[in-house]
Structure formats: C-alpha cells, structure tokens
Amino acid sequence: MPVVMARDLEETASSSEDEEVISQEDHPCIMWTGGCRRIPVLVFHADAILTKDNNIRVIGERYHLSYKIVRTDSRLVRSILTAHGFHEVHPSSTDYNLMWTGSHLKPFLLRTLSEAQKVNHFPRSYELTRKDRLYKNIIRMQHTHGFKAFHILPQTFLLPAEYAEFCNSYSKDRGPWIVKPVASSRGRGVYLINNPNQISLEENILVSRYINNPLLIDDFKFDVRLYVLVTSYDPLVIYLYEEGLARFATVRYDQGAKNIRNQFMHLTNYSVNKKSGDYVSCDDPEVEDYGNKWSMSAMLRYLKQEGRDTTALMAHVEDLIIKTIISAELAIATACKTFVPHRSSCFELYGFDVLIDATLKPWLLEVNLSPSLACDAPLDLKIKASMISDMFTVVGFVCQDPAQRASTRPIYPTFESSRRNPFQKPQRPLPAQFHSSEPKQRSRPLSASDAEMKNLVGSAREKGPGKLGGSVLGLSMEEIKVLRRVKEENDRRGGFIRIFPTSETWEIYGSYLEHKTSMNYMLATRLFQDRMTADGAPELKIEGLNSKAKLHAALYERKLLSLEVRKRRRRSSRLRAMRPKYPVITQPAEMNVKTETESEEEEEVALDNEDEEQEASQEESAGFLRENQAKDTPSLTTLVENTPKENSVKVREWSKKGERCCKLETQELEPKFNLMQVLQDNGNLSKVQARIAFSTYLQHVQIRLMKDSGGQTFSASWAAKEDEQMELVVRFLKRASNNLQQSLRMVLPSRRLALLERRRILAHQLGDFIIVYNKETEQMAEKKSKKKVEEEEEDGVNMENFQEFIRQASEAELEEVLTFYTQKNKSASVFLGTHSKSSKNNNSYSDSGAKGDHPETVMEEAKMKPPKQQQTTEIHSDKLSRFTTSAEKEAKLVYTSSSSTPFSGPTATLQKIPNTHLSSVTTSDLSPGPGHHSSLSQIPSAIPSMPHQPTILLNTVSASASPSLHPGTQNIPSPAGLPRCRSGSHTIGSFSSFQSAAHIYSQKLSRPSSAKAGSCYLNKHHSGIAKTQQEGEDASLYSKRYNQSMVTAELQRLAEKQAARQYSPSSHINLLTQQVTNLNLATGIINRSSASTPPTLQPIISPSGPTWLVQSDPQAPENHSSPPRSRSLQTGGFAWEGEVENNVYSKATGVVPQHKYHPTAGSYQLHFALQQLEQQKLQSRQLLDQSRARHQAIFGSQTLPNSNLWTMNNGAGCRISSATASGQKPTTLPQKAVPPPSSCASLVPKPPPNHKQVLRRATSQRASKGSSAYAQLNGLQSSLNPAASVPITSSTDPAHTKR
C-alpha cells in the first residue's frame, strides 16, 4: 500500500512491513488500476469534509499531492481536496496534480502537462458553452442529419447577422421572445420582448422563441440543472450525475403580456431569484421538495405521483445531452489531438440547463462552462459535494508526487528507486483470501517504463470474464490502455451514470460522430462484444432499451444519501474491515460483526428509519437491475455450482469446529419473544425486571470492554472514539456508585495509562459495580416477596419470557428497551437510583497513576455529603497548615463567596469555600444573650491539639462578622455542629456605623452582601479567652512598659502630623487608604506575635478593626449606657470606622482602594457632603485642640489594673501595648474633652450621607452604647498615629515592620 510504496526498493522485506501491506490492502482511499493492478488511484469521499479523518488525509500527504486554483475561487473544491491530503501551490507552480481553472487554457499550458497532471477543461470547450457557437453546431447537425433529429433548441436567431430572418419569423408568430448575450451566465443581460423594435443591435445577441407553455409545479415555472462529465472526446465518454437541481421562479407564472418584464416570473436562475423577497430557502438537507430549490429526484418523484412518465422524460434528457455534446465533438476532439499530449489529462464538468414544457419535452437553454459550486443551502452541499467527490474518483488521480515526474516522457507513478533499477522489483501481494496460506510478498508500484512494458504482458493474461471482455489480440498498446481506462472509470463511477457509450446508445448515436477515428469503434466493439455479435430481433433490442431506460429512471428518482449517512456507513465498513479474518464462511462472520460493532449500533439506533427510507429507492432500482439483467447474467444456482470446492470444504471444517454457531442459527429460526412489542402494547416492566435488564446491559458493556482489549492494532480515530466511550462509563460510575445503598470504593483509571490498560481497569470496576447492583436488586425482590406485594405478576411481563429475552437480547436491543421504558415512565430512577444514605462515607474515588483527587469527584462529594464530626476533625487536622500561608487569600474567599442575605447561615457561605480548608466549619447558634458563652468553654475539649494559629484563621473568618458583637456573645463554630440561627433578620448587640458602611458598599460597588451585619464567624481556637483572668496582678507592669513623659511628648508630635494629614482638604480623600495599609500591616504582626502567646492570653480582634478584647466578666450583662470617659475616648477615633470599612472593601475585592468611595452626584449623600465640607475646615483646629487635651487627660489620670501585655507592630514600625482588664467592671475616666457639636446622645444607624462626617457622629454615639473597656482600647488605637511607636521608635525603616 502507499505507506510502504513510498520507501525504497532496496529495503529488506520484513514481517512488519508485510503486515502493513496486508492491513492497508483495502484502504478506503485507494483503488488499484493498471495491467497488473499496480497503479494506485485515489478514491474521494464526500463526507471527508465533515469528519476531517486523518486516515483519509494520509494518502495525499504521503505522496505530496497538490493542486492549484487559477482565475476562480471554489471553496468546495478546496475543502474536498484539502480533506484528502492535497496541499495548494502557487498558481504559477508547475508541480501539481490538478489545476482547477475558471477559464479556457492556453495551448502552451496544455502541451506541458504530464500524464499524472489533470486540468478541468478541454481545449475549445467554448464550442458548447458559448451560446452562439452552440447554436451554430446544432444548426450544422440539423442540416446534416435532419431537423427533427436535432430539434433540441427553441427557434433561435443570431443578431444582428440574422435580423431579417428574425423579423420574418416574428411576423408569422407574434409571441414573446427572449434575448440573451452570446457569452454570459447567471441570467445577466437576459430580458423578454414582444416586438423587434425593443432589441438593441449594438452587440451580438441571441434571440430565441420563448417557451410559453412550461411545465409548472404549483403554478411556478422551473428548470433543471444537470451535471454532465466528459472524461474523453477521443473516444467520446459521457457521464450524467444521478442528482441535479430544480430551480423555481419566485412569482407564479402568468402568460399575460403585462408581466413580460417581471424577471422573477420568467427567469429561473438562482442568481436572479435569490434577490426576490419571496425567495424561500430550505435549511434541512433531507427535505428536498421545499422552497425555491428542489433536488431533481424530488421533482421526478413528484411528477411520477402526478401520473407523468418520468422514464420517457429522462430518456429524452439523455438524448438531448448526447446530441449536444456530439455536435461539438469534432472541434474539441481535433483540438485535443493537437494540443493535449495525453488522453487522460483533461476532463470537463458541464452544467446543462434544461427546461421542460407541458408535453414533457426537454429544451436546452444553455451549457455552462464552470457550473456554480456555491453551497448557499444544505441541499447544495449534499448534492455538489457528492458530485465533486465522485467526479474526482472517476477522473482518477494517480498517487504520485508531482515533483518526481520525469521531464522526457509521460509517466505513471515514478519513484526514485524504480528509476534507478526499473527491472528489479518484487511482485504485488496476492489477494487477501490467500494471505493465510501463501507466503507474504511486498507491494511496490511500477515506474513509467515498467507500466508501459507490462501493459501488453498483463493484458495477454486477462482473457477471462471481468477483465477486458475477451481477447485483446490485434489491439495496439494505446488502444489497450484506453479500453482499460474506460472500464476502470466505469467501475469507480459512484453516482455518475455512463450514458455514452452503452450498448444501446452506440447503436443510436454512433453514426452521428464526426471525428472519424478507430477509438470509438474499438471501444464499442470491445465493451459490448456480446451485444454486437448477437443479431437479435428488433423487438429484443427495443425491450433492452426500455429496460435500460427504466433502470436509469430509478437511479434518477432515488434520494441521494446525505453526508452524515455516508460517514456512518464508511465508519461501519472500517469497523468490519478491522475485525479478525475468519475462514471463508458468511454466516458466522456476520454474527461476529454484530458483536464487534455493537457500539456502532448504539449510535445508529435512532437513525435506522432514516437509512431505511433512503435505501428504499435504492432497493427499487436494484430490483430493476435484477429484472433487466436476468437474461444477461448467470442464475444464482449457476454461481453456486461454479463456486470452488475449497470453499465448501472450509465451510464443513468450520461448521465442525463451531457447533455453537449452528445452534444459535437454529435458535434464531424459532419465534423470539418481542419485549419491545409488549411494551409498546401498553405493557410495562416491574422495577425488579427493569433493574435486571439494566444489569444485563451493563454486563454487555463490560464484555465489550474486556473483549476489545486484545492485542490488536487500532487506528487513532478508533482510539479517540473508545476514549470517549470510556469517559462516558467513568462518568456513569462516578454518579451511579453514589446511589448504591452499600458503600463501594471506585478506583477509576487515570488518563495517563495506556488505552488497553484503562479498558481493563474500567471493565473490572464496572464488574464490581454490577455485583453490588445485583445484590441490591435481590434485596429489593426479597423485600417485595416478604411484603407479599406482587408487582412483578401485576405490572411486569411474564417472567419466563422476560428471562428468555434477557438471555438472547443484544446490547442494542436492551438499550432500546431501557430507553423506551425510561420515556414511558418519565424517569430512570427505578434502575439508576436517586439518593444515597447519609451515613455512607466510604464511597471514594482514586485516580490510579495520577496525583491528587479528581476535581469532579471532590466537587460531587462536597455537594452530596454533609460534613460530619469525624470527617471534619480529620480534614481540619490535615489541612490546617495551609492557613498559615494563605490567610489573605482565604479572607477574600470568605467575602466573595458569602451569602447575599444577612444571617443566611454559615452553610451557604462555606459551600463556596474550598472543602479542603473550611469543610470543618458548621453552622452555629447566633442567638444573643449571656448564656451563649457556654459554648466557648466547650472548645478546649473539642480541639485540644490546636493551641496555635489562632489569629490567622480569625482574620479570615471574622472579617465578615458584625463589628458590634459583644465579646461575651461571640459564637464559635465547632466540629460537632451547632444549631442554625432561627431568624434571618436577627441582630446581635448594638449596631455601629460599620453596618451602614458595609451596606452602602454592597449596593454601590456591587460587592457581595456578606459584609452586612449578622455574618459572624469566629475562630474556634480562642477558647481560653472565655476563662476569667486572675485578679490582683500588679499594676506596675504597665508603668514599667510605658514612660509617661515619652508617651505624652510623642503623642503631641504625632497628633500635629495627624492633623496636617487628616484635616487638610488635599489629603481628605487619601485618609482611608493610609489607614487600610496600616491595618493590614498591623494584622500581620498580630498573627506573628500570637504564635508565641499562651492560648489563654490570645486576643480576639474585633471585626471593627484590629483592637484588643478586654476580658470582662462573662456573666456581666450588656452595658448599654456608656460613662463619660468612654465617650471621650471614642470621639478621638473618628477615622477608625473608615479604616474598618476600607479594610472590609480591600479584603472583599483584593485591591486596596486608591480613594474613598464617593456617592453619585445625584444622591443625597453628595449634596450633604458638599454642605459639610466648609464646616469641616472650620472645625479642624477645634478638633485638634480637643484631641490634644483628651490624650493628655488619658495618660495623666489613667490607672489600669491587672494588665496583660500585647505587642503589635503597627504600620511603619509602631509597637504598642495595651492592657486588658478582667474580672471586674471597666474603670471610667473623667470627661475632659467636649464632644463634637454634631454628636447626639442616641441615634438610629442609617446609610451615612458622607463617610467622614458620619464617622465622627457615629463615634461619639457609640460611646454611650459600647462597653467601657471596648471604648478605651478603640480610642487608644484611633488616637495613635501609625508613625509612632511605644516605646518611642519613630523610625520608618521597613525593618521595624518585619521585626
């Protein structure tokens, strides 16, 4: 085959190459030609443009086949050639196999063609395609053979030369006439007249009598486009494609003179009518009789239904085509003899436009040189793609690299090795049926010299029937080549029908041929030797002519197969060719094909009806063929008697070895139980029967997986298809195993493994699934028998018949039954299952040979399995280390994945978080009240081994919590799972302005609304905070840590810097950006410092900012009244709430905002902010003085008892310490600072009109609501500038930050 033939002849023959030759002997794209069948010719497939099959491309690519397109653009031709491995070369290149051009060729180009090169035009084809030349040729034939013999054109005149004759004829009949340019197409320049004065005589035109009685379908005029292929003019060989196009006008036909100018009524050209608003196009290629373009076969079927004689009509059409081409045969054949060096170099596809009148007489309108191959509708693609592919196959492209052609003489395929040693070549391998018994031999093509030298030698041996039709004695080598080429063309004709020469048409039209050469006569006498020697009665000849016409009519009327059907058939044939070869016996082989190609049957179950409809007409035509050729072909009994005795011996031997096959054949003769028929007759299967049928179907799939995993070599397309099938089985096992009541561990094969290994593993896993599935089916049957619920006898079919059907049914039959059962019962849950037990936790998937869990499996487990205490603890202990490296990433996940409704519950939020990190978090009770801190005391016993990593996870989860929660009411989710909050609108503690800011952010910036109040999740590692601190510690720890004078001096200096930045109009917008940066850095320091701190001393960061939690008495009720000292502290932290808001925003979006959010110009917030802008400038200095006085009062009179020290690097190297009081009520400071004028005693929170102004108000308002200890630390942190450090380290070196 071609893959082997491309190698040099000097290669040593090996068994691997012999197997390759044998395996590719029946390649779908190769047909062997020549005297000894040594020349490969490419076979084209129309469906290749859909499949892009590499198996089809490999031949063209191996031989470097090429083409060039000149002066035209045909996308269809380019697509078909490219799909078959051709590559396009430059129009000026001389290395090509095909030149497709849209115009006539120059003589010097024709003379340079080699025998392997082909062009799509003959010289002087304009003798047919120019209207004036066609008219002259027909007139000449009428003068020679009589007017009636060639009356195929309407009465025509060539103007202005015949203007007088036209006027004379018009005076006798004043009907309408049609004017056409002599060299135009697509209806350009065509118009109707009813007076000679309307004609312009400035250029040559053709005037023809208008056929005013056309055949109408639904009152619309139409014509027929026929595709005619001529492969040779000497001898003349004409083919007509079995399918064409019927093109309809868009306006109903009316003979009235008033509509003579309406081209949409009188012209049927597609180029004209597509511009009409009434043009209707059909988008379904299988519907051929709808719209303004039908298939010719659909038109003939319609006429046949109307009682018209379509057989006579198509016989007249063939007569018209043959006479038209014969009229130009002399001129074109003479030009070919003069300019074309090889008889097979040229071919031509003509487009015949034929109009049928009311008497079913066809009239020739015109012949098109290059018929349109545009595919504007699916019907065009189906017809034209099939026609072009069959045309290329008939023409016969020899598989030869065009760059290796010899320049001295015409050649057949030539290879370098053949030219070096043309006389030493191995023999071609024997036919496939002898491979098992005869030695294997290699195949190589002939070189040019070998092909010509062996033509006569090979032809002398071809004297039997089926070769060249008898003896070739007396024929020259050229005549033998021509005879063989014509026979081989007819063997691969596809959808083309040879209408000349045939035994009938030669007798009728042979005398019309004007090119007097011996080739036509030789061809006729050699092709139809039996017909020529038999001098039968005229009645027999007429009967034979009628039978041939009926056969052709049946072929014209049959529906053309669609490209999809062709693709499926070719794929099925490839599967049959890939199966192992068995001894010569048909019956067992067919049974084997059935089992081997069950996957193909599954895909074609729904399309069988379509194929049957399309094959009906083909069977009808085959019936005609059998009837008509019954007299000329031997009978079936004769063929059986003439079969070799070896076959019968092999059949007997095979039957002895395969008694099982014979038993199956005898069983098939018995009437089978048709379960499908029972179901269609309102029968139904029971649940147990449905599961049994489904289990049997799965067993068939398992057997197919195990059987096909043998040591065979399969193609890439087969591997891709099997990979897709295995992927379907894998997906089924993943989902169906979760529906089993019994746990089943599935070890699914990795895609990295080899294909056969994956099939083996998958078959094993499917077998395990079937075993568990059958056990559950048995349990279901036992339960029903115990309960005495006889559903099987009431609803199901007879059990014995059902078991018989199960034993004999194929995979396709079971699939059909299960599909019908599913459609009938509207569900497949009976045999697939719908749910799994909640206690099942052992169904897990592992990918053998792959790293990590399967993503789909993990997601399905996350969706289907609720977290439990054991699983949660295990996962958390395994995955907790990841929190230390991805704290901020998970903080973003919490924000972007949270629920859009407040207090929607942690479950809705945590479903979006990766289960490898947060699968342990469950719902918690969010009810307020002092009794809820009892859950905090349970945490140490639940997680005793996790004292560290407290604040990192806290930053992740607490960022979405409510900032106003009282420490005593914080709820920590535990692995055991706490009850869900009952009320979706429940509020905890007092609200601050943070809720309003978060609400505005969620509305204005389209951020997830998880930042609203009520989404509180805290880390479970802070259980030690619930314990009360020991009282009586020395208060001197605080005085040792802080130097009063240093703090006062530093605070005064930094307060001035803060005022310069915070109260200047230029830095008004960038304030929150600076605070967010400081907050993020401070949070990181808290995380690092907490790692070395005992669990009982670790802080809980308030959601409103990185403050420190004051340990108060757990039983103390909420303090809704704030002392004056607390209020004074809060007024100093007016910018802290904005910092918290931007912290929330930066974590939610992952981007630190460059400026604070500004409301739109039309909102009330903006108007209010503009009014307050001037007031802020006036109040800035007053607020600065108040801040200084407040800070001095704090450090002058503050005494903090029993303190716990905390160190924090805040911003640019700031280290501060704060004390947390515990075991007693917070101490208050005297009120020394006057609150801002805008502060009020009590105000309900609402969306702030301006952030800065409202933050100042909200800060003073919150002072009367929050706890005093809470307020002290908030005020302390808000008053400190990020550039300060205590002890005083005012350096801005980044090293301080990292320390």
UniProtKB/Swiss-Prot annotation:
Family: Belongs to the tubulin--tyrosine ligase family.
Residues the entry annotates as binding L-glutamate: R247, Y270, S271, K293, K384
Binding annotation for ATP: K180, R186, G187, S208, R209, Y210, I211, K221, F222, D223, T268, N269
One MF annotation (Gene Ontology) recorded for this entry: tubulin binding
Annotated TTL domain residues: 62-407
Gene transcribed to yield this protein: TTLL5
Single biological process term from Gene Ontology: protein modification process
Listed Low complexity bias regions: 839-848
Identification of the protein by name: Tubulin polyglutamylase TTLL5
Main location: other
Binding of a protein, residues: R186
